[in-house]
C-alpha cells in the first residue's frame, strides 16, 4: 500500500502579497466596468506606509487610483497606524503608463475572433475528484482556514485578530486516497494584549475545528498555532508585498504544474490569466464527466497568434478513454483562442477582485467552475 504526504499553504487577504493582488484587480475591475475592451497590466507594491501602483493600460476609462487603493486597503482591515499600515494615511504613488503599440499590433485584429495572444506562454489547468469542488483537498482546506480567520476577525468573534495570516495543511494519502490530516499550521497576526494560551484556544476552537472534517483528524495530527509564539508585526510593516507572488496559492497548491504566469492585474487578453481559467474549465468538465479521476491540461500560445501552439492532457493513469481521444474532445468542445475563451467564459467584465484572495479555483461563483460541458463530453466519449 503506497503512502505519502502532501502539503499546501494559503494566505489571508491581509498578507502583503495579497493586498497587492487585490489592489491590482480592483484597478482592473474599475477599468473593465467602464471599458470592457481595455488592455490592463497593473502591478502593485506595498510596504510600511506606502502603496505604489504601476503598469501599462490602454483604455478610454478614468479611474481614481488613489481612492480605489485606499478603499481596498480599508476593506481588508488595515485602518489604524498601530498596524503599521493605515488606509487613510498611507502614501499612494501612481506610475501607470500606456501599453506598447508593438504589443497592440500583435494582439488586435480587424476580426476580433482572430485576436492574437497577448504573449507567449504555457498554462495548466487541473481537476481532481477528491473534493466536491473537484479541487485538491490540501489547498481547499488551507484556503478555508484563512477565510475563516478573516470571518471571525471581521465579525469580532475573535477581536484580537489582525489581517495578516497564513495556513498550511498536510494530508496523508494511501494509494492516492485521503486517509487523514497529518499536520496543520496556522499563523495569525494579533494585537499585543492577547495571551498565547487564549490565542491558541481561540484559533483551535473557532477556526480550525469548524473548518477541518473531524474524520480526518486524530490523536496523531500535529497542530502548530503561531509556532514562533508572537505575531504582532505583520502586513506590509512586516514584509513588502508584490502582485503575482502567490501563484501556487492562487492555483492548486503545488498539486499540479504551473506555467509561471501570475493572474492579478491582467485583463483577459493576457493568456497567463484567461487560458489558465479556460484550462481549469476544461479539466473540471473532463473530471465531472467521469472521463478521469484526475486531469491536468496544458495549453501554450505564441504572441500575436490566435490558435494555441499546443494542447496536451495528462490523467495520471485514471483516464477512462485515451489521452488522444480527450485532446480531440477538447478541440471539439472548447474554443481556446483568446477571443473564444473570453467569450466562452464571459471574461470581459469586472469579476476579478473577488479572485485575488482565497484562490481562483474551486469557487462556484466563477464561470470557469461551471460543469456545463460534462454531459456532452461524456456522450461524445461514448461512455
Curated annotation (Swiss-Prot):
Cofactor(s) the protein requires to work: Mg(2+); K(+)
Family annotation (InterPro entries): ADOMET_SYNTHASE_CS, S-AdoMet_synt_C, S-AdoMet_synt_central, S-AdoMet_synt_N, S-AdoMet_synthetase, S-AdoMet_synthetase_sfam
Binding site for L-methionine: 56, 99, 239, 270
GO BP: one-carbon metabolic process; S-adenosylmethionine biosynthetic process
Keyword Metal-binding: yes
Keywords: ATP-binding, Cytoplasm, Magnesium, Metal-binding, Nucleotide-binding, One-carbon metabolism, Potassium, Transferase
Localization: Cytoplasm
Catalysed reactions listed for this entry: L-methionine + ATP + H2O = S-adenosyl-L-methionine + phosphate + diphosphate
Coiled-coil region: none
GO-annotated cellular components: cytoplasm
Residue stretches spanning the membrane: none
EC annotation from Swiss-Prot or TrEMBL: 2.5.1.6
Residue numbers binding ATP: 15, 164-166, 230-231, 239, 245-246, 262, 266
Molecular function GO terms recorded: ATP binding; magnesium ion binding; methionine adenosyltransferase activity
Binding of K(+), residues: 43
Alphabetical list of SUPFAM superfamilies matching this protein: S-adenosylmethionine synthetase
Top EC class of this enzyme: transferase
Pfam families: S-AdoMet_synt_C, S-AdoMet_synt_M, S-AdoMet_synt_N
Key word Methyltransferase present: no
Xref: PANTHER family: S-ADENOSYLMETHIONINE SYNTHETASE
Annotated family: Belongs to the AdoMet synthase family.
Quaternary structure (record): Homotetramer; dimer of dimers.
Biological role: Catalyzes the formation of S-adenosylmethionine (AdoMet) from methionine and ATP. The overall synthetic reaction is composed of two sequential steps, AdoMet formation and the subsequent tripolyphosphate hydrolysis which occurs prior to release of AdoMet from the enzyme.
NCBIfam families: metK
Protein name: S-adenosylmethionine synthase
Source species taxonomy: Bacteria, Pseudomonadati, Pseudomonadota, Gammaproteobacteria, Alteromonadales
Record gene name: metK
